[in-house]
Amino acid sequence: MSVEVNNESGVELPEAELVRLSRFVFEKLYLHPQTELSIILADREAMEKLHVEWMYEPGATDVLSFPMDELRPGTVSRPAPAGLLGDIVICPQVAQEQAQAGGHSVEDELLLLTTHGLLHLLGYDHEDPEEKAEMFGLQRELLTSFLGRDAPAETTA
């Protein structure tokens, strides 16, 4: 499993934990061992540009996902094929604001956003109530299992 973190934010962050979480999610969702993922930690200005360019919305957001190969979770008997999962872009400054609002640590928020971004790359969405319940339920389940305690509550920018 190849997980690359590129920290362009200028903020020191727990990059190794993001890699460890990503590998954990890969295993839990039966992704091929040669699956590739890139996590980019961007400053507020860069994230705002991406948000406007790709989502046509002003202001920085917390996380954006850019899928490459259309990979989906596998099963025990049928793991997902190898491929390039895509890029997750996270804005640590927005994550810090959300962590404060949510009453949890910045590290917990970064782990939450990484999980959220991974699930988007795997085809999950939260546009309607059923999709949201499925995605957020899986997100909580994965994070709770990874952390060995309750996952932090979801926050929004």
UniProtKB/Swiss-Prot annotation:
Q: Superkingdom of this entry's organism? A: Bacteria
Localization, per the record, is:
Cytoplasm
Bilayer-spanning residue ranges: none
Cofactor remark from the record: Binds 1 zinc ion.
SUPFAM superfamilies to which the protein is assigned, alphabetical: Metalloproteases ('zincins'), catalytic domain (SSF55486)
Single GO cellular component term: cytoplasm
Q: Name one molecular function that GO assigns to this entry.
A: metalloendopeptidase activity
Chain coiled-coil ranges: none
The signal peptide annotation in the UniProt record is none
| Principal subcellular localization | cytoplasm
Q: Quote the record's binding site residues for Zn(2+).
A: H116, H120, H126
The disulfide bridges present are: none
Q: Which InterPro entries match?
A: MetalPrtase_cat_dom_sf_prd, YbeY, YbeY_CS
Its required cofactor(s), as named, are:
Zn(2+)
List this protein's GO terms for biological process.
Answer: rRNA processing
Q: Which UniProt keywords apply?
A: Cytoplasm, Endonuclease, Hydrolase, Metal-binding, Nuclease, Ribosome biogenesis, rRNA processing, Zinc
Q: What class of enzyme is it?
A: hydrolase
Its Enzyme Commission number(s) read: 3.1.-.-
What role does this protein play? Single strand-specific metallo-endoribonuclease involved in late-stage 70S ribosome quality control and in maturation of the 3' terminus of the 16S rRNA.
For this chain, the family text in UniProt reads: Belongs to the endoribonuclease YbeY family.
- The protein in question is named Endoribonuclease YbeY
- Which species is the source of this protein? Renibacterium salmoninarum (strain ATCC 33209 / DSM 20767 / JCM 11484 / NBRC 15589 / NCIMB 2235)
